[in-house]
């Protein structure tokens, strides 16, 4: 099964049908913006810096598209950090990420994750229409959409794994640029016994 969720736990997934609200009112969206791009950013940056000594190579490629919406594909190697590793070099552009329903199924954390930018995969045709509409809307508003196309979270793995080609339909249909972020793990320290994340940014790619 080429799907996964960030939580790492067995959770009864929330039903994402036509009643699920992908689009919210102004107040909800404003609070999401504050939470996503202001209040949480120091935590994201601090965690990435002190836990992983993260380094990004190729940030200038993304900066050239700061006035345009685009898609980002990332390898899936961290449960928690994967939710924000792409957001740091993309900032201050708002970054949304596609997740499985399990990620928003535990209250009250599900709402928090939604406000941080999670867009759950739809469960039926009616929900799919709303899902595609919100992706189109976010891209038109010059936001970015992050997709983890690989199967399961394999911690610290840097090889290429199989993934569903259907995950690439979004940039093809919307004719928008696509970037790739590849998280690698490199040793450092006096005894070469510590690991840091070095993220390589490539693109843009066009269909």
Q: Which ranges hold each PLM region?
A:
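Soluble catalytic domains of membrane acyltransferases
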Residues: 53-207
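A transmembrane-helix-recognition feature enriched in membrane-embedded lipid enzymes
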Residues: 7-58, 108-115
């Amino acid at each position: 099964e080429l799907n996964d969720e960030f939580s790492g736990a067995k959770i009864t997934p929330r039903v994402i049908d036509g009643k699920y609200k992908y689009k919210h009112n102004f107040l909800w969206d404003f609070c999401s913006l504050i939470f996503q791009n202001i209040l949480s950013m120091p935590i994201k940056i601090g965690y990435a810096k002190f836990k992983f000594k993260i380094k990004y190579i190729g940030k200038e490629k993304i900066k050239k598209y700061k006035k345009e919406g685009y898609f980002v594909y990332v390898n899936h190697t961290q449960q928690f950090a994967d939710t924000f590793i792409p957001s740091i070099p993309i900032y201050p552009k708002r970054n949304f990420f596609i997740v499985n329903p399990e990620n928003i199924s535990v209250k009250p954390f599900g709402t928090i994750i939604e406000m941080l930018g999670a867009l759950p995969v739809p469960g039926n045709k009616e929900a799919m229409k709303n899902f595609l509409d919100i992706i189109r809307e976010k891209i038109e508003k010059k936001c970015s959409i992050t997709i983890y196309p690989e199967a399961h979270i394999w911690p610290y793995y840097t090889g290429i794994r199989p993934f569903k080609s259907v995950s690439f339909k979004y940039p093809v249909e919307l004719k928008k640029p696509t970037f790739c972020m590849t998280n690698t793990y490199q040793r450092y320290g006096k005894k070469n016994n510590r690991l840091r994340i070095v993220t390589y940014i490539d693109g843009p790619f066009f269909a």
